[in-house]
Amino acid sequence: NDLPAFWHEKNSLYFVDEIETLEDDHHIRRNLNLTYAIRDGIISHCGEMNQKSIQKRNEYIELKDYQYPGQYNPYTWEGCVVKMSDKIAYLARDIEDALRLNIIDEKQVEQLKKEINMISSYHFDAINNGTIVNYFILDVCQNSSLEKGICLSDEAFEVMKKMMSFNYKNIYLIDRIEVHTNYVQLILNSIFQFLYKYETIAKENQINVIEALKEDQKKYPITIQGY
């Protein structure tokens, strides 16, 4: 199909703009009608960027014109905080999840802890979500300013890069995850292509997509009923 590639920040903006509703005092469901600042924070929050400091931008941008994740910095300081938080949040959480799923073991985490303690003036007794999040929050609070933006110290940035490198090498890019990723992509792409076909059928016959699906419900009872 001719649809653009999926990326979750832009999809999230589309969802709150076009799909999500909220019930008002009269029990009528209405669009969320979010402010520009909140919508901007949603689409610009991607934390998978190698940035030590995040400065807010000063120019207004039409948010639907974003072409790729991380294209622009957020418009507000609050958005910058969210972007930095997104970067911090997944580092230790992914390590904890990988331990729970036996993707990595305690020896690997212990080695990571030793390597981090070699470059950090703060001594880590453990690598877990609470410890790591607390470390980075304190560092951001101590090093951020109007001039520098929402900022990490040089030391904390090195700790962050060390953890990101560990995660990519031992979690994200290993064969076991690649096999699972390919499996999930196959399932999601198959479901998408199946439903997208009915979007085309609905347009050609000038009917609602739901009506088009109901026409073939007996052929595909599990797929369509689940949808």
Regions flagged by a language model, labelled:
Residues 1:
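Active-site-proximal cofactor/substrate-binding loop regions of enzyme domains
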Residues 5, 10-11, 15-227:
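Histidine-centered, transition-metal-coordinating active-site segments
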